[in-house]
Amino acid sequence: MLVLKRIFQNDKYTIGRLYDSNTYLCDTLEPPKHVNHPCIDNGTYKISYQPSKKFGRNMPFLLNCNGRVGIMIHPGNYPRDTQGCILVGRNITKGSLSHSKGTFDNVNAIIQAILNLNGSVTITVQ
């Protein structure tokens, strides 16, 4: 099970840390709570691979996000790169992520490994 622990929020972005059990994987970037496409609510969500037109391949989507659809985990560096999705990378510079594509590839491999081992994978957002 993946766990996303949010550690900082302001009016421009939300920063978190993503874990596999208790093992730190990466940092995350989401929009703030009070915008047109806010970060998702705290809760546990099943992850399913679905085709993404934006990325041209199957991507990890979060299911049953309180009526919202299209919420996925994907690479990106800045708040403008997300419309409610969870971006992954390294939070080295305030308000942004770096090394996002390589980090996504690592996280994606972990999600696929969990899915292959357990038949399902969830993420708990706190």
Give each language-model segment a name.
Residues 1-121, 126:
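Cell wall/extracellular polymer interaction/catalysis modules
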